[in-house]
Amino acid sequence: LVVDDCVAVASSLYGLALPTERRNAALATCDRAVTGFAAASPTYAYAYYVEALLAAERADPTVLNSALGASRALAPTEQWLAELRVKLAEDHLPQLEPTALAGHEADLALLVGSQRGIRVIARRYAAVAGFRERITAIVETLPTEQQQRFVAALRSEIAARRPAAPTP
């Protein structure tokens, strides 16, 4: 629960709307708590993700990269966590070092291979032009069946984005 509260402070509208002094104090408290949780339970991949999120908030690329890497190493196939890592990595792509970037690409491949994840990736592909080249390069390395599923999901997403035809 404490870790989820820290995510809310870092990324929710409530957290973003806090007065700067209170928000900074809450982020510092969260940073200490999450670092403590990760140290006390070194297999707690979510704590490392939140540590990466907090590092991004304070513009600390070293911790961002190492914490993203730790989260991925501990939970490489946890889709819900991969979704969180992908969003964080995409938001901070220029700060990713080669190892973190490779982990990010592995998370993207994991998501494309799953029913729920493929929709998330197709939605991002349709919405963010800068994402298309990166995900296309990854999808092209996957088995033909997964590529076809991605194209179908993408077509569905694009069709859903089209405005409805006016009724006479």
Task: Enumerate the predicted regions with their spans.
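Charged, low-complexity, helix/coiled-coil-prone segments
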Residues: 4-17, 26-30, 43-53, 143-154, ...
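Amphipathic alpha-helical repeat scaffolds of TPR domains
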Residues: 1-17, 41-54, 79-91, 117-121, ...
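Alpha-helical repeat scaffolds
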Residues: 24-38, 62-72, 98-115, 136-140
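Short coil/turn connectors between adjacent alpha-helices in alpha-solenoid helical repeat scaffolds
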Residues: 11-24, 56-63, 96
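Short linear, low-complexity motifs centered on an aromatic residue
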Residues: 86-97, 102-103
